[in-house]
């Protein structure tokens, strides 16, 4: 076996659950959100959140507009409330931010990613032929300075200072530190 961490962010339900079951160490979903909040193609079910929790895995909540309730119009409060609600399904020590950002990249980058090199057909992911580019970021997270907004938003929905710091980075650090 290879000592690596498996990331199932781009995988469907069955594959994700199978990876959690088969892996000898915890896996991650580095950038997705719960389906209970938004029915995005890559967002994860309560069953996956529970399996991640029980196996010691991690989820990073995504800021990519196609993964967000109300897309680019998602509010900071809604996003932070989703994180708080998620802690009923997965430990606050097993959650983080997985921004999945390509800020200020031209649409040609996403066109290249979706060019269908192997399938020979264009895959628009969660976009469409009419809306194939990068959607605008929510106003509260237009770049890395948005972490200040996340800090405030998490505190506003009831997370302690320690929990907020854990969610904003310490949990990822502690998770990966176990695999040195």
Question: Could you tell me what each predicted segment is?
Answer:
Residues 53-76:
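A conserved active-site cap/scaffold subdomain adjacent to cofactor or substrate pockets
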Residues 132-180:
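Mid-to-C-terminal alpha-helical segments outside catalytic/metal-binding sites
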Residues 9-12, 55, 62-63, 164, ...:
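Glycoside hydrolase catalytic-domain context in secreted enzymes
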Residues 1-28, 41-57, 77-93:
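Histidine/acidic residue-rich metal-binding segments in metalloenzymes
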Residues 90-140:
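Short acidic/histidine-rich active-site segments
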Residues 11-17, 34-37, 65-69, 103-105:
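Active-site environment of divalent metal-dependent phosphoester hydrolases
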Residues 24, 53-54, 84, 88-91, ...:
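Sec-exported extracytoplasmic/periplasmic mature domains
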Residues 6, 31, 59, 100, ...:
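Conserved, mostly hydrophobic/aromatic
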């Amino acid at each position: 076996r290879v000592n690596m961490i498996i990331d199932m962010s781009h995988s469907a339900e069955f594959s994700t659950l199978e990876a959690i079951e088969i892996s000898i160490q915890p896996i991650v979903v580095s950038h997705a959100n719960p389906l209970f909040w938004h029915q995005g193609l890559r967002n994860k079910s309560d069953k996956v959140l529970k399996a991640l929790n029980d196996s010691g895995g991690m989820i990073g909540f995504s800021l990519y507009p196609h993964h967000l309730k109300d897309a680019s119009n998602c509010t900071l409060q809604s996003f932070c409330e989703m994180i708080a609600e998620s802690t009923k399904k997965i430990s606050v020590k097993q959650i983080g931010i997985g921004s999945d950002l390509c800020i200020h990249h031209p649409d040609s980058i996403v066109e290249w990613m979706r060019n269908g090199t192997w399938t020979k057909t264009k895959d628009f992911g969660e976009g469409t032929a009419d809306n194939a580019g990068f959607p605008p970021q929510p106003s509260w997270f237009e770049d890395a300075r948005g972490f200040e907004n996340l800090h405030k938003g998490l505190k506003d929905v009831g997370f302690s200072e320690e929990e907020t710091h854990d969610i904003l980075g310490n949990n990822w650090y502690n998770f990966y530190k176990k695999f040195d």
